[in-house]
C-alpha cells in the first residue's frame, strides 16, 4: 500500500496544475485602449478639445487652485498634472466627454481613471478614494458625469486627500501638458 502514495501524490500534483492552467485560460484579458469601440474612438479624435474645462472636483473654484505642474518628485520625475485639494469623498467629475479607457489601482496613482477625450486627449484622475460604483472600461461619459471620489491612495497615502488631474495630448501617459490653464 505504501507504494501507491507516490503515484497518488503525482496524480494530485498533475491535477492541480491542470486546474490552475484551466483557471488562467478563462480569466478575462486586462482592459486596454484597443478594446474601446472604434467608432466612438474615431468620433472623439475628430472632435476639438475645449479651451476651457471645468474643475473636476465638486465645489472647488479655479481661484483656489495652485499650479503644481512641473514640481519635483521622487526618482527624478516632475509633476505631470495639478493637485486639487478637497476633503476625502468629495465627488470627482469628468472634465470632458469621452470613453473610460482604464480603471485600475497602481503604486503611484492609487485608484485611477483614464478617460480618452476629444482630439485623442487622455485625462488622468488619480489618488481616488474609490471609483464610481458601476463605472466600467468602455463606458461613455459626458462632461460633468461622476467618475469617483477624492482620496489619497497610491503614493499619496501620507498626504492630504486630493485629486491629481493630468492631461496628455499624444496618447495615454504621453505628451503631458499643464492642465491648469485649461481649468475654469
Task: Please state what every model-predicted region is.
Residues 25-111, 143, 177-180:
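Surface-exposed, glycine-biased beta-strand/turn segments
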Residues 56-58, 75, 107, 134, ...:
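Extracellular/periplasmic catalytic domains that process cell-envelope and extracellular macromolecules
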Residues 95-137, 162-164:
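Zn2+-dependent peptidoglycan hydrolase active-site motif and core
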Residues 114, 139-184:
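Conserved, short, structured surface segments that act as functional micro-motifs
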Residues 2-13:
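Bacterial N-terminal signal peptides that target proteins for export
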Residues 20-23:
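C-terminal motif of bacterial Sec signal peptides marking the signal peptidase cleavage site
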Residues 67, 86, 102, 127-130, ...:
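A residue-level detector for short acidic-glycine micro-motifs
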Amino acid at each position: 500500500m505504501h507504494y501507491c502514495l507516490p503515484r497518488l501524490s503525482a496524480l494530485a500534483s498533475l491535477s492541480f496544475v491542470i486546474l490552475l492552467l484551466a483557471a488562467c485560460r478563462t480569466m478575462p484579458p486586462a482592459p486596454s485602449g484597443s478594446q474601446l469601440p472604434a467608432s466612438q474612438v474615431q468620433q472623439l479624435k475628430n472632435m476639438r478639445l475645449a479651451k476651457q474645462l471645468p474643475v473636476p472636483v465638486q465645489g472647488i473654484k479655479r481661484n483656489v487652485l495652485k499650479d503644481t505642474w512641473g514640481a519635483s518628485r521622487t526618482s527624478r520625475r516632475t509633476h505631470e498634472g495639478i493637485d486639487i485639494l478637497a476633503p476625502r469623498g468629495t465627488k470627482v467629475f469628468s472634465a470632458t466627454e469621452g470613453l473610460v479607457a482604464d480603471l485600475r489601482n497602481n503604486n503611484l496613482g492609487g485608484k485611477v481613471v483614464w478617460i480618452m477625450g476629444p482630439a485623442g486627449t487622455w485625462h488622468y484622475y488619480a489618488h481616488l478614494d474609490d471609483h464610481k460604483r458601476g463605472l466600467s472600461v468602455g463606458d461613455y461619459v459626458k462632461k460633468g458625469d461622476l467618475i469617483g471620489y477624492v482620496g489619497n491612495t497610491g503614493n499619496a497615502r501620507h498626504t492630504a486627500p486630493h485629486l491629481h488631474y493630468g492631461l496628455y495630448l499624444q496618447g495615454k501617459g504621453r505628451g503631458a501638458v499643464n492642465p491648469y490653464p485649461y481649468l475654469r
